[in-house]
């Protein structure tokens, strides 16, 4: 069932006039603890008015993260390090070929509504996928963005993007992960997002037959972000936020 969040009024998350969101790209994989420390520091600075909002694009080395709803049984095989984290959600995989976007926005100033914010993140991904002629969809009982897979059988769907966020003083951090061309076999070692129904799997742009560069995905993400959340300002590649 398609979630009624698809009717989201995208004007619910406007930026203040004249304010730009920093848009930062790291060109080498960032260790997870380093990323979390940088996000927490930036979120605190945003909350205190000492820094601007930020979208941080990066990749991680292969690893698993477990959110606040994660269960020990969701890790089937410890192929890579597992990090417990304060984001919402359960267990997922991060690694090369996956575009992670950490989103640090001041929702108190924009609109303090977590559910609508998550719907906004989904809309951002869906519009990004539209660039590549992929139909991403929301689902009522499954956060993230899904792609119908009738080629696998009736009712089959695969997740192409995961969402997990945390708020502190109404500033968001953590964010989204979009599968561009990761090694999907690494998801076999976990129960992704706690979903055990065999009809629901994981996919990527490459798995769907699209070989695209991360730079092309980044450009699409930035365009779609501007439509949903407002304009951004590109910063030179760095390894920390």
Curated annotation (Swiss-Prot):
SUPFAM superfamilies: Class II aaRS and biotin synthetases
GO biological process, one term: protein modification process
Active-site residues per Swiss-Prot or TrEMBL entry: 193
Keywords: Acyltransferase, Cytoplasm, Transferase
GO molecular function: lipoyl(octanoyl) transferase activity
Main localization category: cytoplasm
Function: Catalyzes the transfer of endogenously produced octanoic acid from octanoyl-acyl-carrier-protein onto the lipoyl domains of lipoate-dependent enzymes. Lipoyl-ACP can also act as a substrate although octanoyl-ACP is likely to be the physiological substrate.
Family as reported in the entry's similarity comment: Belongs to the LipB family.
Matches recorded under NCBIfam families: lipB, PRK14341.1, PRK14345.1
Protein name: Octanoyltransferase
Phylogenetic placement of the source organism: Bacteria, Pseudomonadati, Pseudomonadota, Alphaproteobacteria, Hyphomicrobiales
């Amino acid at each position: 069932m398609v979630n009624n969040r698809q009717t989201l009024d995208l004007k619910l998350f406007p930026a203040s006039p004249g304010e730009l969101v920093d848009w930062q790209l790291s060109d080498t994989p960032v260790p997870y603890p380093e990323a979390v420390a940088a996000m927490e520091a930036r979120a605190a600075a945003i909350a205190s008015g000492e820094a601007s909002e930020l979208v941080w694009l990066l990749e991680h080395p292969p690893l698993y993260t477990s959110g606040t709803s994660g269960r020990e049984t969701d890790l089937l095989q410890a192929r890579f390090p597992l990090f417990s984290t304060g984001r919402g959600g359960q267990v997922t995989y991060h690694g090369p070929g996956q575009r992670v976007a950490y989103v640090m926005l001041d929702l108190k100033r924009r609109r303090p509504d977590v559910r609508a914010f998550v719907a906004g993140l989904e809309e951002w991904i869906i519009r990004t996928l539209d660039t590549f002629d992929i139909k991403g969809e929301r689902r009522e009982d499954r956060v993230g963005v899904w792609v119908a897979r009738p080629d696998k059988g009736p009712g089959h769907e695969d997740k192409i993007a995961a969402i997990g966020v945390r708020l502190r003083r109404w500033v968001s951090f953590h964010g989204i992960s979009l599968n561009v061309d990761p090694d999907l076999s690494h998801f076999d070692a976990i129960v992704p997002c706690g979903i055990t129904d065999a009809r629901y799997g994981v996919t990527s742009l490459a798995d769907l037959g699209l070989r695209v560069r991360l730079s092309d995905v980044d450009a699409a993400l930035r365009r779609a972000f501007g439509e949903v959340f407002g304009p951004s300002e590109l910063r030179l590649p760095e390894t920390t936020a």
